[in-house]
Amino acid sequence: MMNDTITPEPHLVPGYTGHCTENRDRVGKTYGKQTHKLLIDPCIYHAPELIVLPIHAKQGLKDYPTEHELKVLRRREDLVDAVYRHPILPGYAGFVPNMASQTGKRYVAAASAGVAQHETLMELYRCENRTLRHRDLLESGKGLFERKLNERLLPQARYRSPLIPVTGRSKGVKDEECPPRVDKLRYSKFTSPHFLEDDDDDKFIINGYAAHIPMAVTRFGESNQVLTHRALCSFSDYMYKRKRDAWCCGQDLTRPAVTCPPVGHFVIYHDDIGMVPSYAGHVPGELYKFGRTYGKTTINAKRWLDIHRGLTGLPEVSNLDYTY
């Protein structure tokens, strides 16, 4: 009867909030007896070390921080002005190197391991820096001591530092004068980016431009400035190289290609044809016209501006003729 009331060891005390392997899949027994069977079952995959240690456990059984990490931290305090000193207590809100890569450890152990890894990397950098300074000293010829075996294996150049300035026959050669640099014209609202030079920084279309951008349909995955710049470069190359005869008809083709086509190619509102229905830009007077298609309404849209150039009142009360 006494054996039935006493839970055998080992077992977990009821109220333990930690993890117990396969405990949620077993039912029908008390927490103590159930965890006892789970802890001694050889068929269950347990962690390599128990989280709950016996009371009589020795203090030397802790694995973290390791002896190597403590040695690195002590040596660091002797060599440099150490900001991080062991132990770093929990609650420290500052930055600790390599802290994010330490998992499954207490705060003191994780902080010690992170600082030890950082110090090991910095020691490697300091060693490489000393090797480079030592090699420069050997190549400069200022070292008066005999070179050792490891110094002979260092890669050496055929010259000595610092380099000595040489003045020879080239002193009498006249320097070539470069042509004066022509300053680029400043960008303005009347400048079209379509036919600017490919290396021009202003050859792109700003965000919010609602009209057609040539050769930009097949491009994606780039920012607006990069995408429109490459699209305009492809467009200008195509127009200059593939259709040079069509652009430059009536001109002397023996001369270099023109830098910009005629201004008539950039007309938006034509006198004899209307805008395409998908045009999302502004059309003068389109708001006050109705009863016809979009293409018929937008023919010669600038005439609306000429009619209302001297108008002082609203178009609704001016009783003007909109039959054009």
UniProtKB/Swiss-Prot annotation:
Primary location class: cytoplasm
Domain of life: Eukaryota
Keywords in alphabetical order: Cell projection, Cytoplasm, Cytoskeleton
InterPro entries named in the record: CMI2A-C-like_dom (IPR018902)
Location(s), subcellular: Cytoplasm, Cytoskeleton, Cilium axoneme
Residue stretches in coiled coil: none
GO cellular component: cell projection; cytoplasm; microtubule cytoskeleton
Family annotation (Pfam families): CMI2B-like
Similarity field: Belongs to the CIMIP2 family.
Function: Probable microtubule inner protein (MIP) part of the dynein-decorated doublet microtubules (DMTs) in cilium axoneme.
Identification of the protein by name: CIMIP2 protein GA14893
High-level lineage: Eukaryota, Metazoa, Ecdysozoa, Arthropoda, Hexapoda
